[in-house]
Structure formats: structure tokens, C-alpha cells
């Protein structure tokens, strides 16, 4: 009896067990859920990573490699495609036993290694031997890597038996290369910088000193090292260089004073792209100072992912508008073959690539067209800044409206959107002669149209005047009728003889009114007949103008034929 537990304790134990079983059974990656996972890799700052269980990496701080743990999901970052979890319990610990006193390799360590083997996607493999108890090989990411190359590597991720790293440049190498640079090597170089908020002003320039150019922590995906941040200037082009030589590294020395002119509306704290105009070194005893004068080229320059997104959006717009459809393959010019998509069967170098044809039309390479359009835009902006005039030409139906709109919007341009006359630019003298012949015909046409319009206006004015007179007369008649009605009402009380006299007068006046009405009706009929005659005359004039127009077209055709014959003879 004493060993038996009370019923409420048994119920509480059952509830705790069921809750634990529920926690371990959850497999969905939702914030708040408790999940069980195995740590397959180690990142920086002692962060354990599970890479493959849930499709996206799950970061668990303070976890060790090889452990199976229970963790509570805190956040899921959809933009970076990672999840963050909090360690609750270690289910199974690592089985690794330290048989020797060797140290363990951790992320963030820098090593000098020699590449012994090449891997895929610009990677190299370095053998670490028995220097560490958890890693034997190191996979290094670097463009144009070669076997036997000595590289300084920053370890980014550690796994069971191997690790990943990124090639870096030490500060000693940076200082050695930067001191060996000459004035000409700096002149014209470009850097993306952030103007410090504590920069001082001297006349029209912002003045700030370059701090120590230290190598920053590099991400696994991006291997371009920018050494300008919070005052540090430089760009490590050696990492992305094909030769991989340190001679191509361009960095500003640490004891450099920069003079930057704040144009393009740049302010302190803004990200800008600068270009070095002048570079000089000043010696003061044992100390040497470098002075660089730069100008701002671009304000808030786009990063590489932003540039790619902008290019993709512009290509989508070009595809929607159908700019990739070329002319028929039969009409294709030989010079346009470089700007058309081509395909090649097999790997034989002797076989020429043929243009890609769909529905009898060539497909234009939109990447090349975009490059050419940007070049043309840059050239046009130069001419527009000088105040030059432009001629827009587009005779197709799709382009005619756009051409006219663009020319009218610019206010200093001309456009041709109906028909392009041959030799308008190359043979302007003959076209001027044909224009001089057409001008008198056009003047005659304008005079005829002007006469017709004047006659119409005079007829319209006369009709309006007559209508107004009729309106006045009708008003007078109405007044007289009202007076007669009043007189009749007054004379109703008089004798019958008076009534008969009034009736006689009323009949006489009605007769007069009827006669006048008939006269007005006859006049109106005459006016309508005159109007019909004028309409007939107008139609005759229109036919005459059409004949004149056809004669003008015939003249232009004969002129063009004459020009063609003349060109053939010449």
C-alpha cells in the first residue's frame, strides 16, 4: 500500500509523457514547433547546421558536429532560405574520441595551404594531413585556381572529415602591393565608397583619411572582396582575376588622404562611385603621405544582384513587345548574323553555327540588342546635351505612332512616319526640285479650299440672319394675335352687329396672314434650292481637287522614275 502512487500523480506523469511524445513526433518546420535533427556541419560563431532534413539549412547555436538534438524553431527567413532554431536538448552526443592531442579546426580560422587537386566549379582541394583531429581535407573556392598554388584561406564551414574555405589576401600582401604602385596605376581607377559622416570640408572638397585596409569576412557565395567600408578603400581584383597574380591588385595605401568633390547631389553617408583623377606622394622626413583627388561618377551605384534583376526585367519587357522576332530568313543581311541566335550540331570546330529559325524568321539576340541600345542612348545623350536636332524615322504601323510621339515630346526634332522617299538624305538636291514642282499645286489646292470655306461661311451667315428675321416677325404676329383675342373678349358684351364686324375684320386679317405665310414658304423653298445648287458646286470643287491630287501623285511618280533612270545611267 505504501508503494502505490496517488491517482493525481499518475495522471500528471501520463500527461507529461504524452506531451514529450507529441514534441518529438513533430516534423514540420513551423515557428514554435520542436523538431529533432542531426548537426551535419559547423558554421562561424559555434553555430551548428542541419542542411538536408527540411530542404533548407537550419541553424542551431551552441550545437556540436554529429550530435542529434531537439530544437525549437524561432524564425524562418524566406528571403535567405534559412531557419533559426534554439537548442533544447541533446539526444545523442558525438561518438568521436580524441585519441591524440590534436586541435580541432573551427570556422573563422585562416590557413596557408597548397592546392593538391582540382575540383568542379573553380574549386581546389588541399590536404591537411594529420594536423587536425576532425578534418583531413580543405575545399577552397577561387577562380582560375591551379595545382601547387599557395593560398591563404578563410575557413567558412566544417563538416565530418572535410571543410570549406574562401581564398583571401593578407594585410601584409595588401601593403606590399599598395606601396609598389605608381601614380599612373591609380589614375583613372574606380572605387565604390561610402562617404564617411565625420568627413571634413576643405573649400569645395570632402577630406577624409583612408584607414587600415583589412580583409573582411567573405561569404560562401560571393568571392569579390571589397576593402572599402567605413573609410577603408580598395578592391581585391586578384581573387576574380584569371591569372591570379598579386600584381593586378589595386588598393589605396593606408596613409592616403582623399579629396572628393561632392557633385551629383551626394551627401555624407551616401554610397557613391568615385574615380581617381590625380595621385601624388609627399615626403616629410621619415613620414610619407599619399594624396588622391577623386570625382564622383555615379550616385548609389547598383550592386551585382540589382543589375541582374534590372537586366532581367528589361529583357522581359523586350520579349513582351516582340523585339526578338526578326525579318524573314530570306531577307536577312549578312552583317546581322552576329546579332542573331545560332545553333551548332556536334562539337566539331569545322562545322559552322547556323542561325536559329522559327516560322521562317530569325530570332534576334536580345542581350546584344540591349548592349547596342545602351551605347546608342549614351551617344544620343551627348548630342542632346549639346543641343543638336534629331530626325526620327519609323514607317511601320507599330512604330509610326511612337516615332511621332517621341519627336513631339522632344520639341526640337523632326520625324517621318508615313513613307520614306529614296535619297532624302543622300540626294537632297533632286528632292528639292520635286518639292518645288509640287508646291504650286499645293498652293492652288489651298486657295480652292479657302474659297469654298469662305462661301460656306457667307451662306451660313445669310441663313442665320433670315432665320432671326423670321423669328422676330413670328413674335410680332403672336403679339397681334393676343391683342385681337383681348379685343374679342371685350367686344363680347357689345351688340351682335359689333360681333359681325369683328368677325369680318378677323377673317380679313387671317387671309392676309395666310398670304404672307405662303410668300415666306415660297422664299424658303427658293433658299433650299439655292443651297442644293451650292452643295452640287461644292462636290464639283472636291472632284477637281481630287483630280489635282492625282496629277500631283503622277508627277511625283514620274520624278522618282526619272531619278531612278538617272541613277542607273550614272
Curated annotation (Swiss-Prot):
Its main location: plastid. PANTHER family: 30S RIBOSOMAL PROTEIN S2 PROKARYOTIC AND ORGANELLAR, SMALL RIBOSOMAL SUBUNIT PROTEIN US2M. NCBIfam families: rpsB_bact. Residues 1-306 are annotated as: N-terminal extension. Belongs to the universal ribosomal protein uS2 family. One of its GO terms (biological process) is translation. It comes from Chlamydomonas reinhardtii. GO terms for molecular function: structural constituent of ribosome. The keyword Nucleotide-binding does not apply. Keywords: Chloroplast, Plastid, Repeat, Ribonucleoprotein, Ribosomal protein. This is Small ribosomal subunit protein uS2c. Pfam families: Ribosomal_S2, TRAM. SUPFAM superfamilies: Ribosomal protein S2. Residues 28-89, 104-169 form the TRAM domain. It is found in: Plastid, Chloroplast. One of its GO terms (cellular component) is chloroplast. CDD domains: RPS2.
Amino acid at each position: 500500500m505504501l508503494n502505490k502512487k496517488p491517482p493525481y500523480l499518475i495522471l500528471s506523469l501520463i500527461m507529461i509523457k504524452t506531451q514529450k511524445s507529441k514534441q518529438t513526433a513533430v516534423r514540420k518546420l513551423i515557428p514554435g514547433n520542436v523538431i529533432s535533427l542531426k548537426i551535419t556541419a559547423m558554421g562561424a560563431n559555434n553555430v551548428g547546421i542541419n542542411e538536408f532534413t527540411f530542404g533548407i539549412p537550419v541553424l542551431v547555436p551552441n550545437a556540436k558536429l554529429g550530435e542529434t538534438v531537439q530544437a525549437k524553431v524561432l524564425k524562418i527567413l524566406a528571403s535567405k532560405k534559412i531557419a533559426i532554431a534554439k537548442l533544447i536538448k541533446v539526444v545523442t552526443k558525438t561518438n568521436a574520441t580524441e585519441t591524440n592531442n590534436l586541435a580541432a579546426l573551427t570556422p573563422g580560422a585562416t590557413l596557408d595551404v597548397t592546392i593538391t587537386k582540382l575540383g568542379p566549379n573553380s574549386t581546389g582541394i588541399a590536404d591537411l594531413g594529420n594536423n587536425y583531429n576532425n578534418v583531413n581535407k580543405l575545399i577552397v573556392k577561387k577562380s582560375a585556381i591551379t595545382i601547387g598554388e599557395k593560398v591563404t584561406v578563410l575557413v567558412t564551414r566544417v563538416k565530418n572529415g572535410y571543410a570549406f574555405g574562401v581564398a583571401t589576401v593578407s594585410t601584409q600582401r595588401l601593403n606590399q602591393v599598395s606601396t609598389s604602385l605608381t601614380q599612373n596605376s591609380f589614375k583613372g581607377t574606380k572605387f565604390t565608397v561610402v562617404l564617411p559622416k565625420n568627413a571634413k570640408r576643405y573649400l569645395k572638397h570632402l577630406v577624409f583619411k583612408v584607414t587600415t585596409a583589412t580583409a573582411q569576412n567573405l561569404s560562401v557565395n560571393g568571392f569579390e572582396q571589397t576593402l572599402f567600408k567605413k573609410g577603408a578603400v580598395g578592391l581585391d581584383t586578384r581573387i576574380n582575376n584569371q591569372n591570379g597574380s598579386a600584381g593586378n591588385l589595386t588598393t589605396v595605401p593606408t596613409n592616403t588622404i582623399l579629396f572628393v568633390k561632392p557633385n551629383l547631389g551626394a551627401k555624407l553617408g551616401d554610397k557613391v562611385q568615385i574615380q581617381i583623377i590625380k595621385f601624388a606622394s609627399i615626403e616629410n622626413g621619415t613620414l610619407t603621405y599619399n594624396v588622391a583627388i577623386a570625382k564622383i561618377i555615379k550616385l548609389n551605384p547598383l550592386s551585382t544582384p540589382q543589375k541582374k534583376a534590372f537586366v532581367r526585367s528589361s529583357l522581359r519587357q523586350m520579349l513582351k513587345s516582340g523585339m526578338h522576332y526578326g525579318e524573314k530568313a530570306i531577307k536577312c543581311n549578312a552583317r546581322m548574323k552576329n546579332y542573331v541566335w545560332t545553333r551548332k550540331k556536334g562539337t566539331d570546330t569545322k562545322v559552322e553555327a547556323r542561325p536559329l529559325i522559327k516560322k521562317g524568321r530569325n530570332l534576334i539576340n536580345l542581350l546584344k540588342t540591349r548592349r547596342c541600345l545602351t551605347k546608342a542612348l549614351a551617344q544620343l545623350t551627348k548630342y542632346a546635351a549639346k543641343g543638336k536636332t534629331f530626325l526620327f524615322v519609323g514607317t511601320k504601323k507599330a512604330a509610326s505612332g511612337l516615332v511621332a510621339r517621341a519627336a513631339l515630346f522632344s520639341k526640337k526634332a523632326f520625324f517621318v512616319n508615313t513613307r520614306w522617299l529614296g535619297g532624302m538624305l543622300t540626294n537632297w538636291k533632286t528632292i528639292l526640285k520635286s518639292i518645288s514642282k509640287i508646291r504650286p499645286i499645293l498652293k492652288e489646292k489651298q486657295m480652292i479650299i479657302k474659297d469654298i470655306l469662305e462661301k460656306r461661311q457667307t451662306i451660313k451667315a445669310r441663313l442665320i440672319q433670315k432665320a432671326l428675321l423670321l423669328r422676330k416677325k413670328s413674335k410680332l404676329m403672336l403679339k397681334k394675335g393676343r391683342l385681337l383675342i383681348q379685343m374679342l373678349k371685350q367686344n363680347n358684351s357689345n351688340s351682335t352687329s359689333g360681333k359681325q364686324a369683328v368677325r369680318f375684320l378677323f377673317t380679313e386679317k387671317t387671309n392676309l396672314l395666310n398670304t404672307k405665310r405662303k410668300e415666306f414658304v415660297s422664299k424658303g423653298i427658293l433658299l433650299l434650292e439655292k443651297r442644293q445648287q451650292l452643295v452640287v458646286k461644292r462636290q464639283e470643287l472636291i472632284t477637281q481637287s481630287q483630280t489635282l491630287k492625282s496629277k500631283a501623285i503622277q508627277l511625283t511618280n514620274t520624278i522618282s522614275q526619272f531619278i531612278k533612270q538617272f541613277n542607273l545611267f550614272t
